[in-house]
């Protein structure tokens, strides 16, 4: 006996996978919808810029503060720079950025496609011989995969700068030591692996948003439900997949 | 020629279409009447392949839509135009872009040419100079007319209308009916119209078919339907709550 919820979960997984793979197959078949892609790159990426900068900066700042208080007990304050760089590039940059973008863009994608579904705009596309998956889903998922790593580079950068500011300017750690330990502890692969995570998270949050929106039913209430579900499910999926990606990569 | 042969469609336990047969004559208008929730929209969606039947065939010029792959469906849909119940205009585009959409997707016409066709189609539904408005700025009747202009953009051979007059005031409803009748006469297209507005149906139809309990229980010319002996059809046509159809 597997139980209904488990079966529903497996079925949901299957349907998400089918949507994802058909969207990706459409990416390689004409017509190439460059203008729609650019619009989504702008929506997912450019318009998340400031919120990512602010969350990134404060994340770096609080990490510097916390590690400083911890490491001061062993007179190891100089390690703050290295720990900051590692935790931001490996974990906090990708995860926090992805959660923020899931809340901002993932929910908006679900709401937009959900509204198009319940007002029959998706059927209208199909009736006019345009594939709705290619028209609506493909550009959004591509935008997620491309834009999340770029946003995370930004978040990593401002996170480190914010941490540097707190550690060196406010708490008085020696600037040379701070930098030296950063270079000693961190490797290029830490940054790169973080960006791979970011791309996976970008894929997850846009695919879940598209899936929930595309299969919305039940009017305005259904759109509301799809939007909430998109955020909850993609947040869970991001955190769970983060564990497994970390286990594989580091 | 469109033919539905022995079509079934169920959602879970609910049987919506139950071994339904219907033939739609080429170049004429067939109006399908029936109760709300009776499966009229489901029937119409089968005609353009938006839904696939559980059993049976949907034949368009002899080809079975139910067995087509995506590419074949796409090809055949280019000869269809469909007006949805609430027009289903793209609310992220203005009126002009909505009407231009199928032209941009499926023709290699130039910008100026498309603009001219859009203006012409909008004029033919009595809406000139609204190209730059957004759908949200329009009244229900105007939205339907823009939806009609969009459905006509590619000069389709087959036009499907899902409740084109529901929710409109009687004058606007009559204007839309006139538009449908004139469009059909002008283009010679095969039209399938879903409606529960009997007055409108009698005005535009060459044939009227009644959908009841998942089947077409009667089909005939407007006169035949008006004078039918069938108690179910009589009750519907006369609009009485008492009779063989259980209303509540
Ligand atoms: N996609 C669907 N999933 C489940 N049930 C549906 C779906 N589409 C229609 N139905 C059901 O089929 C019945 C007929 O619907 P419809 O064809 O829209 O009726 P109408 O004659 O008013 O157009 C309704 O009871 C509706 O709930
Ligand atoms: Mg309907």
Regions of interest found by a model, annotated:
Chain B
Residues 153-157:
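A short, proline-enriched helix->beta-strand linker immediately N-terminal to the Walker B motif
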Residues 134-138, 142:
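Conserved ABC ATPase signature
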Residues 159-162:
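Catalytic Walker B motif of ABC-type/P-loop ATPase nucleotide-binding domains
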């Amino acid at each position: 006996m597997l139980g209904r919820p488990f079966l529903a979960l497996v079925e949901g997984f299957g349907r998400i996978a089918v949507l994802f793979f058909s969207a990706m197959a459409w990416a390689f078949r004409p017509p190439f919808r460059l203008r729609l892609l650019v619009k989504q790159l702008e929506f997912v990426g450019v318009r998340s810029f400031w919120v990512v900068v602010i969350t990134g900066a404060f994340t770096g700042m609080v990490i510097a503060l916390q590690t400083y208080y911890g490491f001061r007990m062993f007179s190891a304050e100089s390690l703050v720079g290295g720990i900051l760089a590692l935790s931001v590039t490996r974990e906090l940059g990708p995860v926090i950025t992805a959660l923020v973008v899931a809340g901002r863009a993932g929910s908006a994608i679900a709401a937009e496609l959900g509204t198009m579904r319940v007002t029959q705009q998706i059927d209208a596309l199909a009736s006019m011989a345009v594939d709705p998956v290619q028209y609506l889903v493909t550009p959004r998922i591509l935008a997620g995969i491309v834009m999340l790593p770029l946003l995370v580079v930004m978040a990593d950068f401002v996170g480190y700068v914010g941490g540097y500011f707190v550690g060196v300017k406010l708490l008085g750690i020696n600037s040379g030591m701070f930098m030296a330990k950063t270079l000693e502890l961190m490797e290029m692969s830490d940054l790169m692996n973080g960006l791979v995570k970011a791309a996976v998270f970008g894929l997850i949050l846009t695919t879940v948003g598209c899936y929930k929106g595309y299969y919305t039913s039940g009017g305005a209430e259904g759109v509301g439900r799809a939007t909430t579900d998109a955020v909850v499910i993609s947040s869970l999926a991001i955190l769970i997949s983060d564990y497994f990606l970390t286990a594989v990569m580091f | 020629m469109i033919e539905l042969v022995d079509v079934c469609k169920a959602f879970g336990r609910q049987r919506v279409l139950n071994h339904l047969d219907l033939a739609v004559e080429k170049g004429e208008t067939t109006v399908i009447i029936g109760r709300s929730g009776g499966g009229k929209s489901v029937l119409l969606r089968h005609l353009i392949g938006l839904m696939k039947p559980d059993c049976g065939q949907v034949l368009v010029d002899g080809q079975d839509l139910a067995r087509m792959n995506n590419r074949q469906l796409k090809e055949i849909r280019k000869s269809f135009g469909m007006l949805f119940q609430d027009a289903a205009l793209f609310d992220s585009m203005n009126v002009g872009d909505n009407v231009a959409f199928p032209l941009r997707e499926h023709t290699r016409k130039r910008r100026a040419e498309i603009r001219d066709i859009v203006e012409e189609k909008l004029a033919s539904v009595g809406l000139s100079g609204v190209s730059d408005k957004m759908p949200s700025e329009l009244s229900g009747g105007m939205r339907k007319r823009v939806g009609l202009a969009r459905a006509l953009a590619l000069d389709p051979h087959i036009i499907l209308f899902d409740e084109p007059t529901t929710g409109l005031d009687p004058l606007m409803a009559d204007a839309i009916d006139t538009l449908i009748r004139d469009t059909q006469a002008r283009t010679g297209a095969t039209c399938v119209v879903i409606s529960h507005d009997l007055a409108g149906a009698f005005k535009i139809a060459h044939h009227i078919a009644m959908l009841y309990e998942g089947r077409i229980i009667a089909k005939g010319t407007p006169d035949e339907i008006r004078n039918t002996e069938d108690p179910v059809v009589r009750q519907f046509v006369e609009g009485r709550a008492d009779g063989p159809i259980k209303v509540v």
